[in-house]
Regions:
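Glycine-rich flavin
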Residues: 2-8, 24-31, 36-156
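Glycine-rich Rossmann-fold phosphate-binding loop(s) that bind the pyrophosphate
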Residues: 14-17, 38-39
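Residues forming the Rossmann-fold NAD(P)(H) cofactor-binding site
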Residues: 20
């Protein structure tokens, strides 16, 4: 069963960097906005790419500095990296950023909808959620679904 249509000035498919930035800006311009994400808002950069990678890179830089601390006149002994603690550090950074982003989206009045979206026609988006299907009527639609790598089956 499809619920009644909800009308929006802008519906955005994909809650990664481009999608959430567009949603926040459109909301600031007084548009009624729905942002649809099938996973967690923030996309690859926040959850699996840029942010967690940089957090772990920071751990490596600190480890390197501790190992070379004698050159700074600091006496210490490097005993290795506790990977469980490093992963916990990384997860904490990702979680704080995700919560901050979610709060900002909510504060700007964007309707964040968790589900799988499909274009029904030029002004209608159907969203499959855990609660059922929604139909959203949109004056404008942005496709910000990102990309996924695909192997081409050639050995290199």
């Amino acid at each position: 069963m499809v619920e009644s249509k909800n009308s929006y000035d802008l519906v955005i498919l994909g809650g990664g960097t481009a999608g959430y930035a567009a949603a926040i800006r459109a909301s600031q311009l007084d548009m009624k906005v729905a942002l649809i994400e099938r996973d967690k808002v923030g996309g690859t950069c926040l959850h699996r790419g840029c942010i967690p990678t940089k957090a772990l890179l920071h751990v490596a830089e600190v480890a390197h500095s501790v190992r070379d601390s004698k050159s700074f006149g600091i006496l210490s002994e490097f005993q290795g990296v506790d990977m469980e603690a490093a992963i916990k550090f990384k997860d904490g950074i990702v979680d704080r950023n995700h919560k901050g982003l979610s709060g900002m989206i909510k504060a700007d009045g964007v309707d964040l909808i968790s589900g799988e979206a499909k274009l029904k026609d030029q002004s209608t988006v159907t969203v499959s959620t855990d609660e059922g299907e929604l139909e959203l009527d949109a004056k404008n639609i942005i496709l910000a679904t990102g990309s996924e790598p695909k192997t081409i089956g050639i050995e290199i």
